[in-house]
Structure formats: C-alpha cells, structure tokens
Curated annotation (Swiss-Prot):
PROSITE patterns: GALACTOKINASE, GHMP_KINASES_ATP
Annotated positions binding substrate: 34-37, 220
EC main group: transferase
A Pfam family that the UniProt record links to this protein: GalKase_gal_bdg
Key words, A-Z: ATP-binding, Carbohydrate metabolism, Cytoplasm, Galactose metabolism, Kinase, Magnesium, Metal-binding, Nucleotide-binding, Transferase
Reactions the enzyme catalyzes: alpha-D-galactose + ATP = alpha-D-galactose 1-phosphate + ADP + H(+)
Signal sequence interval, chain numbering: none
Annotated InterPro entries: Galactokinase, Galactokinase_bac, Galactokinase_CS, GalKase_N, GHMP_kinase_C_dom, GHMP_kinase_C_sf, GHMP_kinase_N_dom, GHMP_knse_ATP-bd_CS
Name of the molecule in the record: Galactokinase
Enzyme Commission number: 2.7.1.6
C-alpha cells in the first residue's frame, strides 16, 4: 500500500498546492474464468491490495496536467480538444476524459499526480486500475453522479476505442466493484455479480514469472477472432446464439466435426471454462477449497492445451505449485504468454510454498520470479490512509 501522505507531499512539491482528493483503484487477479469475458461468459476475479493512486485537484480552466510519479513523466492536454498521444500511458488518461465527455458528463480541467504499486506488464490489470482511478478522480472533482457499472463501461470504452486494446469488461468491473475478502462471480453479458467470501485460512499467492509478454497482444486478438469464427459456424445449427456463452458442451459434441482446428479447441476451452467458473464459485460458497483447486488445475490444462496461451516456463511454475505442501490449485492468470500464475495456498504454508516455488523455478529456468501474497480488497474509492486533511 502506498503512503498517501507521501503522495500529498509529492503533489504539493510538483504543483505548489495540496490535492483536494486522493483516490485509489485496485489491480486484480482472476481466480478462474480465463478468456471468457469477451465471450459474454463468467469470470471470478478478486481485487488485490495493490492499487493505482491519483492525487487530484480541480482547475477552473480546460487544462489537464498529469504527472506520473513512477515514470517521472508528464502530460498536458486540453479537456475540450483531446487527441491521441504517441506516449501510450498518456492515452489511458486522455481516453477516460474523452469517454466521460462523450457520455455527456461536463468536465473542468485538473491537476493529477499518479502513482501505483500494481506491477506493470504482469497481467494484473495495471491499465484498468489507472483508467478507473482517473475516471473516479474526475467524477469526484466534478461532482458527477456515475454508477459503478457505468464507470467500468466508460473505462473499458476508453481502452477499446482510444487506446486501441480490445479488452473485455472484467478488469474495469472488478476495479470498481471489488469487495474486501471476497471474490466476485461476474456475468460479463449483463454485468450482474455476486460476492463469494474467501476462506480466511487460504491465501491468494501470485507469482510473476518475469517473462516478457511480447506475444500477448497479437495472440489475444487472434483468439478473439477464432472464438467469433466458432460462433459463426455454429449458428448454422443454433441461429440464436450470440457468443460462446450460449454454446453448451452438448452443442460442441454434436457438431465438433464442423469446427476445424484450432477453432474447435478454442471453443472447447471457453465452453468448459464457463462451467468450471460456475462450479468453482459454488464450491467456494460451501467452503470446498479442494474442489475449487481441482478446477483451477483443470483450467490451466485447458489454457495450455486447448487455448494454447501458456509457455513451458509458466507450466513449470504451475506444475511445481501443484506438488508443494498447502497448495490447493494453481494456474496461469491473465491473457497468457508470460505474466503471472495464481495459487490458492493454506495460509500457514505460504512462506515455505513461496520459498520452494522460487527456488525450483530459478533452478529450472534461470529466472528470478516475484511473489505477491495478496488479500482481496475493496474496489475504487477515496484513499484516506495517512492523507491528512484534504482541502
């Protein structure tokens, strides 16, 4: 957790005045339900206790000034003349401001200072945390009445339409709606959700492989296209389907010969992953961590074999975790081709689990991974810890 008192001091040093508000939006890790969100399916993420913070103060002109404490970079743009920048991180902020204006929300300019302890490039949704935090800062500064789901959709729209990344809704939605000590089962079609408590005896352990995700963007778009192609082919027999969410395992079995590879395997992963996600949420609701862990393991096998988004070194992390004491289940999380694994581990075994996982991975690959032991946190809101009086 970042110290908000330090953020206030940095803001004052940079802008010569205290911020009027500091907000935070968390990163996320998805326990199960991978590559299902853009297929109108089900996901089961938690908001983690690492977040992006925005210290902000309203201006009374059209100017937005942004300083990144982490990158030591700045951006300035006019709120009524928003254009794309050649600096990618600028566009997340500009895109959110534009999305708010297009939706009819009047904005004044602002001074913003951004800092984050969400690891970038690890698949923990640092970009969604940034979008949601900036959107919420604009909301607070301008006294806007925006429901949580609307803020998530606006942030997703900014990433889709302005940044140019065709992400699903999960990352932004959990950044808005996350609940401490709970995972959220989210229906990505109608955005309905229910909170499921996490057993207090179990820890969420994230392991960053530090494998650069150089193929993630192109492969992600390719997988989306393959899923869309599966839907188009299956509409010959099931004209009412809108997405793979509407396809059952029986549908696939009846017409698998009509789906060429790799489209058949992609569809099989999504359809079965939706089932696993629903079963997993039900298992945790009744406190059955063993069943949930087994479903996590099945999910990884499907991501590896059917969706083909894992890598050998990621498989080493997962297989090693499976054999360590206290681990109920482990899998790749995020888009794939690097990034992180997530494991559910008995809390009193976390220290030895982490030590042994890092050792085996380093011996096998030569890489040094990073462990994050996370707690499920609340979604976006004001950050008041150590902030002092907010003016």
């Amino acid at each position: 957790m970042l110290d908000t008192g330090t953020l206030r001091a940095r803001f004052q040093q940079h802008y010569g005045i205290h911020p009027s508000v500091i907000v935070r939006a968390p990163g996320r890790v998805n326990l199960i339900g991978e590559h299902t969100d853009y297929n109108d399916g089900f996901v089961f993420p938690v908001a983690i206790d690492r977040a992006t913070y925005v210290a902000a103060r309203l201006r009374h002109d059209q100017l937005v000034r942004v300083a990144s404490s982490d990158l030591n970079e700045e951006d300035t743009f006019a709120i009524d003349q928003i254009e794309r920048s050649n600096r990618p991180w600028h566009n997340y902020i500009r895109g959110v401001a534009l999305a708010l204006r297009v939706a009819g929300h009047p904005l004044l300019g602002a001074d913003l200072l951004i800092a984050s302890d969400v690891p970038r490039g690890a698949g923990l949704s640092s970009s969604a945390a940034l979008e949601v935090a900036v959107g919420y800062a604009f909301q607070v500064l301008n006294n806007l009445n925006i429901l949580g789901e609307e803020l998530a959709l606006l942030a997703q729209g900014a990433e889709n339409n302005f940044v140019g990344v065709q992400c699903g809704i999960m990352d932004q939605l959990i950044a808005v709606l996350g609940r401490a000590d709970h995972a959220l089962l989210i229906d990505c079609r109608d955005l309905s959700y229910r909170a499921v408590p996490l057993p207090p005896s179990v820890a969420v352990v994230i392991c960053d492989s530090h494998i650069p995700r150089t193929l993630a963007a192109s492969a992600y778009n390719q997988r989306r296209q393959e899923c869309d192609m599966a839907v188009q082919l299956l509409r010959r027999w099931y004209p009412g389907i809108r997405a793979l969410r509407d396809v059952s395992e029986d549908h696939l079995a009846a017409h698998s010969d009509a789906l060429p590879e790799p489209i058949r395997s992609r569809a099989r992963h999504v359809v079965r992953e939706n089932r696993r996600t629903l079963q997993g949420a039900e298992a945790l609701e009744r406190g059955d961590v063993v069943t949930f862990g087994r479903l996590m393991n099945e999910s990884h096998a499907s991501l590896r074999d059917d969706y083909q988004v894992s890598l050998p070194d990621i498989d080493i992390l997962v297989e090693t975790a499976h054999h360590l004491a206290g681990c109920y289940g482990s899998r790749l999380t995020g888009a794939g081709f690097g990034g992180c694994t997530v494991s559910l581990v008995e809390r009193n075994e976390v220290e030895s689990f982490s030590r042994d996982l890092l050792r085996v991975y380093h011996n096998a690959t030569g890489r040094t991974a990073t462990i994050y032991v996370c707690r499920a946190s609340d979604g976006v809101g004001r950050a008041t810890d150590n902030a002092g009086p907010q003016e």
